[in-house]
Amino acid sequence: MPRIFNLARRMAGPDAADELTQDVFVRAWQKLALFRGESSFATWLHRLAVNVIIERFRTLGTARERFLADSEAVLEVAHATRTKHLDLNMDLQAAIAQLPHGARTVFVLHDVEGYKHEEIGDILGVSAGTSKSQLHRARQTLRVLLRKEA
């Protein structure tokens, strides 16, 4: 469960992580009969989680901008109250949360979760090249954001 929650937190932010984690386990219960054992259960559950989270962003449609604006407001408040003694992990998490949705999704799937660009492309419905460019953009943005924090 912590792995699914952490994935949801990284991809969608801390406010949505609890609800998305619950949605993943509800969906897993509903789809359990479809588990064929071709991979480990953890791998199947993780892939299901990625799909549920991405589906949530797709169904948000125009509400997605409002969701992202709310996330930005939370980040602004969090940034204003931060002390000088936060560790690099907290700075990195805040920087990841500031990435545009597409770049953040690719970054988390590739660099954090270990997916290959071809797998990411299949999940997101984009080419491997698009995944690579999104990852490059995410890494560049993170460098800039983390330099500002230093």
PLM feature spans:
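Helix-turn-helix DNA-binding motif, specifically the short coil turn and the N-cap/start of the second
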Residues: 116, 125-130
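Sigma70-family region 2
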Residues: 10-14, 23-40, 59-63
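Arg/Lys-rich amphipathic alpha helix in sigma70-family domain 2
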Residues: 33-36, 50-68, 85
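Short, charged helix-capping/linker segments at alpha-helix termini
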Residues: 5-23, 128, 150
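Short, Lys/Arg-enriched C-terminal cap helix and immediately downstream tail that follows
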Residues: 58, 104, 139-150
